[in-house]
Regions:
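ABC family nucleotide-binding domain
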Residues: 1-224
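C-terminal boundary and immediately downstream tail of ABC-type ATPase nucleotide-binding domains
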Residues: 221, 225-244
Length: 244
């Protein structure tokens, strides 16, 4: 948390290298994301990102929005498996019978990839009570509905961490509660999350650790009890006096 322009969103975007850090490193599950040898796209598959403005694909219905990434990744993996098998078959042409390498069977198909992605999408939509909206387009939905679908879209990739960039800042006040309730559910289930937020009450209730940023630096960090109950940094004290 912190005032506008303090670097919160930039910090968040550096975590999955949507922004290149000017100094230092970002490690995710032992991998240095700033190392050019690391395939950042593979690492990003395990990071869900939810933006302020939803960033849904307006030319796709809700179901397509949710299944797009899982189907795309599934098809990439299927093509890689087919290419690997083709290489084995080709090399086997030049080997004697006793030295031919067995060709492993494909574990999936395009039809299966699409069906599994759609089943998972419908399960997630049912969880948030929006299964009836599967075939509608984002432009027909409320802000709260669009943001919940954006969260579900990220969850469809089974991420190991979720990054939220002010997920309620573009919502009408009465829509905020339904989005925060979903995020709280994820917290209760043990999902690792990094959330940029101005919802102080929510941060106090849900967070296990709070960072206060100002001027592009972390000025103070600690448990919610420490940050909200006994702040030490003068800038943090001033900030809390204005927002609480």
């Amino acid at each position: 948390m912190g005032p506008s322009g303090s670097g919160k969103s930039t910090f968040l975007r550096c975590l999955n290298v949507l922004e290149d850090p000017t100094d230092g490193y970002v490690f995710f599950e032992g991998n240095n994301l700033c190392d050019l040898k690391v395939d950042i796209n593979v690492q990003r598959r395990h990071m869900g990102m939810v933006f302020q403005q939803f960033n849904l694909f307006n030319n796709m219905n809700v179901l397509k929005n949710i299944t797009f990434a899982p189907v795309h990744i599934g098809m990439q993996e299927l093509r890689a498996a087919k290419l690997k098998n083709f290489k084995i078959k080709f090399l086997n042409l030049f080997k004697s019978k006793d030295k031919k390498q067995p060709v492993p069977p494909l574990q999936t198909s395009k039809k299966q990839i699409v069906e599994e992605a759609e089943q998972n999408a419908m399960r997630l939509l049912k969880r948030i009570g929006l299964e009836a909206k599967a075939n509608v387009y984002p432009s027909t939905l409320s802000g709260g509905q669009r943001q919940r679908i954006a969260i579900v879209r990220a969850l469809a990739m089974s991420p190991r961490v979720m990054l939220f960039d002010e997920p309620t800042s573009a919502l009408d006040p009465e829509m905020v509660g339904e989005v925060l309730a979903l995020i709280k559910e994820l917290a209760d289930e043990g999902m690792t999350m990094v959330i940029v937020t101005h919802e102080m009450g929510f941060a106090r209730e849900v967070a296990t650790r709070v960072l206060f940023m100002d001027g592009g630096k972390i000025q103070e960090q600690g448990t919610p009890e420490q940050i909200f109950g006994a702040p030490k940094n003068e800038r943090l004290k001033d900030f809390l006096s204005k927002v609480l």
